[in-house]
Amino acid sequence: GNSYWDGSMSHFHWCDGYAYQASDFGETDATTGEWKIKTSPSVSYGTNGFFILKDGNSVTDQSPNTNNFTVAAGNLTKTEDCPSNVFCTFNPLDTGTDTGSLLNGNTSYSQSQGDSIGTIMGPKGGKWYWEAKIGSGHGGAGANDSNYYFGACFLKENNTWATNHGAMGICNGGNQSNTFALYNNTGSGSITQPSVSPPAAGTIVGIAVDMSGGTSSIKWFFNGTEVGSITGITHTDFLGCTVVNQRFTGTATMRSIEYNFGNGYFGTTAVSSAGTNASNLGIFEYDVPSGHTALCTKGLNE
């Protein structure tokens, strides 16, 4: 057919001639209350049934049948995201007027100009880490990169991401025209500005958010080295923290950025040398800062 699945799949069962209940494939965790997968359900597959995408990107039938599939074109990208541990992604329902294009399970974003986009998770505490690989169209301060940001936003009731964010980027307005800097719009905290050039295409930016104490902090890393921070952010009335994606204005060419929230990929390219991660949740290019973990459902429940 000419219709294509635009998303991620895991543990795909087709039970030919049978109508099973959801409880045959999943159950409620007695400790956390989460709905969790039954990795080996007791079901029958009939003649034409199959079970693919079990614990990876294999389309070889894992049922007693041999109804194997082949990939007609391209590649199936493996992801750590699965029914038992859902990782953060961007939310296509939480966008501005110019949404750009979301790809690779809503982790890659391409846009020429327009608004921000939110994510599906917004924790109220904890220590979190994610990475973003700068893609095409980012050449440094100047008209072609006006107004792009990435960082974290501490949400308050009836506020948008632009109200209480701490972000790294280039601003083309006010008295800091086309200045690469950290911008703190949270109403509190102090900034350690970067003394490096704007990240060029290919740079992997690590972002670490600490909401574990009475105040919060955001730190930025270029290829594993810390380059700037905002510390001492008060958050007593924050409802949660979300990822700040880029927000472009102007008439520049298409620009892109690829996020790794722990899936181990930037777009369709796997990390080249995974860093250490004490929590063992997620795969990142560089070492995860002490005490931090991936923004995922297992991390939220720790």
For the regions a protein language model found, what residue spans apply to each?
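Short hydrophobic/aromatic patches on beta-strands that form ligand-binding or substrate-lining surfaces
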Residues: 9-13, 52-53, 61, 130-134, ...
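Extracellular glycan-interaction patches encoded by glycine-rich segments
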Residues: 1-9, 249
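Short, aromatic/His-centered strand-loop micro-motif at the edge of beta-sheets
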Residues: 182-204
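Extended recognition patches within non-cytosolic domains
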Residues: 8-67, 73-82, 219, 227-229, ...
